[in-house]
């Protein structure tokens, strides 16, 4: 009976396969390809005092049709040290934040995967619970904790461990701490999903052969959880590069990230072509780890 039902379902879906594919294709076109094309078009135009504030790429003359394309915005980005520093600062902070998330999240995911079954759901809820509250409220909460009159400084002053408040706000440390706190669940959940699928018989076999716990972890558990590590790192690193809210609220003038520069170019300077070029270069940088991850997944599927 189940086999007959499966055959009927396949016969029903076969002529409708095009419609099934059309739904995600339409979604991808409307919310990725179309915005991508608009941003690319603006990045190849020139700034102008107009609404919108850029020149048209296509100029309709009396008897001619002229296409105006300029790569000056991209050359300007590469020649200005401010934008190069912003890209480098974003990549550096995103990398450190991702590494910190991995160092904190892996032990958490490992402990969750090894916990009794009735505790795993509770631990999962505790990991996801902060994400159910407003992202902005959680960032503002860190402002109250890290400020000169915040919880940490007041506690240290009360204990007599410091004589004056430690400056933690408006620093790269505060930005990294905020990113780690905000994106830690995106590291823990893929790792947990990967670690729960590990074959315990491999660990038992290693133990029977006399392998110590640390050697079993390094030679069996860690290599088999590589997929979860890469997936979690991508989920943290990619949004962290373009993060705007956390650097704006917790960072200072020395915190130069591409998200803040993009905001200033779009809304303060109203230089949409340069801002669009910034976004396109950032997208190009982010496509590199995505392509590497896709290549790794393809190789794993073949093996």
For each predicted feature, which ranges?
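Transmembrane alpha-helices
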Residues: 23, 125, 129, 181, ...
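Membrane-interfacial helix termini and adjacent extracytoplasmic/periplasmic loops
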Residues: 10, 61-62, 139-180, 214, ...
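N-terminal signal-anchor/first transmembrane alpha helix
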Residues: 2-46, 111, 121, 125
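Short membrane-interfacial helix/loop motifs at transmembrane-helix boundaries
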Residues: 33-81, 252-253, 303
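Interhelical loop and adjacent transmembrane-helix boundary motif
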Residues: 11-17, 47, 60, 74, ...
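C-terminal transmembrane helix and the adjacent membrane-cytosol boundary/short C-terminal tail
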Residues: 2-4, 8, 19, 192-207, ...
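Transmembrane alpha-helix signature in integral membrane proteins
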Residues: 79-114, 180
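Cytoplasmic-entry segments and transmembrane alpha-helices of multi-pass inner-membrane transporters
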Residues: 20-21, 107-145, 203-204, 217-218, ...
């Amino acid at each position: 009976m189940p086999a007959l039902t499966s055959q009927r379902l396949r016969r029903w879906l076969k002529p409708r396969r095009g419609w099934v594919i059309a739904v995600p294709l339409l979604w991808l076109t409307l919310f990725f390809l179309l915005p991508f094309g608009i941003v690319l078009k603006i990045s190849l135009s020139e700034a102008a005092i107009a609404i919108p504030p850029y020149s048209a790429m296509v100029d309709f003359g009396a008897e001619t049709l002229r296409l105006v394309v300029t790569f000056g915005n991209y050359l300007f980005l590469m020649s200005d040290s401010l934008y190069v520093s912003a890209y480098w600062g974003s990549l550096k902070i995103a990398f450190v934040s991702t590494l910190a998330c991995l160092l904190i999240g892996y032990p958490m995911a490992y402990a969750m995967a090894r916990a009794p079954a009735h505790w795993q759901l509770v631990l999962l809820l505790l990991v996801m619970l902060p994400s159910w509250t407003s992202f902005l409220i959680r960032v503002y909460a860190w402002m109250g904790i890290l400020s000169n009159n915040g919880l940490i400084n007041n506690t240290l002053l009360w204990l007599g461990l410091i004589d004056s408040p430690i400056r933690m706000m408006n620093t790269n440390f505060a930005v990294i701490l905020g990113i780690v706190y905000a994106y830690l669940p995106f590291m823990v959940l893929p790792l947990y999903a990967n670690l729960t699928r590990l074959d315990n018989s491999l660990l038992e076999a290693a133990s029977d052969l006399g392998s110590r716990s640390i050697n079993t972890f390094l030679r069996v558990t860690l290599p088999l959880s590589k997929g979860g590590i890469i997936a979690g790192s991508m989920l943290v690193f990619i949004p962290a590069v373009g993060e705007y809210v956390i650097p704006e609220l917790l960072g200072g003038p020395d915190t130069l990230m591409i998200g803040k520069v993009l905001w200033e170019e779009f809304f303060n300077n109203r230089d949409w072509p340069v801002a669009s070029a910034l976004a396109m270069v950032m997208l190009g940088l982010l496509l590199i780890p995505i392509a590497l991850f896709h290549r790794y997944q393809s190789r794993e599927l073949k093996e």
